[in-house]
């Protein structure tokens, strides 16, 4: 992990890898993130930058690699997946978060974008399946409950590598 982190640093900063922050633009060059539809959210969630520039320290980078490793538990993966999918960072997945999630998965082009009616129906179906307390949002425990019924979740989510 340290070798991968330091290889992404600009040439003059490699010797200070433990104390320097890796710019988001460099993080996004990782093959695992390059084509990932959630690449910007992943950087946001794992970055501890006070400037909110989504840069990462070595510790942030290590946290990201740990969560996406095969040895991370489903509970840890689901917590981070929830945070990645919570676009407005309010602690719940509401209709807008779900719409953003669907748009990330289907793409933004005209031919792949869902119609308004299709999007509304899909979000309604997701909420019917997941919103146990019927408050119109999905909280972390509801998300984890749905995930617990998906045996492939730990292998494929968060959808990174």
Give the predicted meaning of each segment.
Residues 8, 48-49, 83-87, 128-130:
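Calcium-binding motifs, dominated by EF-hand helix-loop-helix domains
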Residues 117-123:
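Mid-core helix/loop region of P-loop NTP-binding domains shared across ATPases and GTPases
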Residues 72-76:
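Short pre-active-site segment immediately N-terminal to the catalytic Zn-binding motif
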Residues 90, 133-135:
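Acidic carboxylate motifs that coordinate Ca2+ or other divalent cations, activating on Asp/Glu
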Residues 4-10, 17-39, 43, 56-70, ...:
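Amphipathic regulatory helices of Ca2+-sensor modules
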Residues 25-28, 123-127:
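Amphipathic alpha-helical segments that form the core helices of the histone-fold
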């Amino acid at each position: 992990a340290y070798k991968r982190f330091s290889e992404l640093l600009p040439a003059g900063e490699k010797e200070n890898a433990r104390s320097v922050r890796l710019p988001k633009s460099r993080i996004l060059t990782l093959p695992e993130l390059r084509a990932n539809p959630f690449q910007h959210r992943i950087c946001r969630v794992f970055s501890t930058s006070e400037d909110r520039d989504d840069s990462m320290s070595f510790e942030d980078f290590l946290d990201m690699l740990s969560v996406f490793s095969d040895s991370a538990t489903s509970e840890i993966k689901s917590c981070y997946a929830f945070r990645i999918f919570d676009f407005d960072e309010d602690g719940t997945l509401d209709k807008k978060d779900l719409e953003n999630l669907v748009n990330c998965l289907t793409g933004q082009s005209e031919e792949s974008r869902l119609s308004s009616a299709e999007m509304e129906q899909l979000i309604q179906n997701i909420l019917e399946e997941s919103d146990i307390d019927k408050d119109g949002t999905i909280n972390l425990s509801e998300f984890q409950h749905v995930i617990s019924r998906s045996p492939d979740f730990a292998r494929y989510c968060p959808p990174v590598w």
